[in-house]
C-alpha cells in the first residue's frame, strides 16, 4: 500500500525538493530516482516523504528543549529559526562554535539529546560533536552527501530556498501532530512562506 503523501508529489517537485546535484555519493544511491539529461541527479520524493514521517514520530518523543537544529547555509537560517520557534527546539545558525556540545565550561554549551543538521558537509563541526557525545543525528542529505554517522537520512535538495522551507515546515507540522499539539493538519497555522528565507 502506498504511504500517505504529506503534500502532493507535484508540490514537492514544484518546490525543487527533488533536485539533486551533478555529483552523486554512493551513500545516496538508494534515494536517487533518476539522472536527468543534463547530468543532474533527481531524488525520489516518495522516500523524502517517508523519511519525514519517520523523523516526525522520532522527534516527537523528545522534549522540545532536547532537540538542536543547525544550519551553516544562509537559505536555511529562516527555516531553521522558524522550525525552532514552532517546535520549541533550539536553533544554531551560522558558525557552530567548537565545544558547543562537548565542553560544559563554555557559556554557549548546549546539552541536547538529538540533532538535526541541514547539510552534513557544511555542518561538519556539529556532526563531529554529536558523534563524540553519542546522540542521534538526523540529516537533510542531498545527492552528493556522505552519510557516515547519520542515523536518519532525509533525502532532499538541502541548498534551495523553497525546498528548505518545505522540509522544515513539514517536519514541524509532523512533530506537532505526533505530539498531539494539533489533531489535524488544518490546525497548523503556519504556511510554507513563513519558513522561507527572504531574498
From Swiss-Prot:
GO terms for cellular component: small ribosomal subunit. InterPro entries: Ribosomal_uS2, Ribosomal_uS2_arc, Ribosomal_uS2_euk/arc, Ribosomal_uS2_flav_dom_sf. GO terms for biological process: translation. Keywords: Ribonucleoprotein, Ribosomal protein. One of its GO terms (molecular function) is structural constituent of ribosome. It holds the Pfam family Ribosomal_S2. PANTHER family: 40S RIBOSOMAL PROTEIN SA. HAMAP family: Ribosomal_uS2_A. Belongs to the universal ribosomal protein uS2 family. This is Small ribosomal subunit protein uS2. It comes from Thermoplasma acidophilum (strain ATCC 25905 / DSM 1728 / JCM 9062 / NBRC 15155 / AMRC-C165).
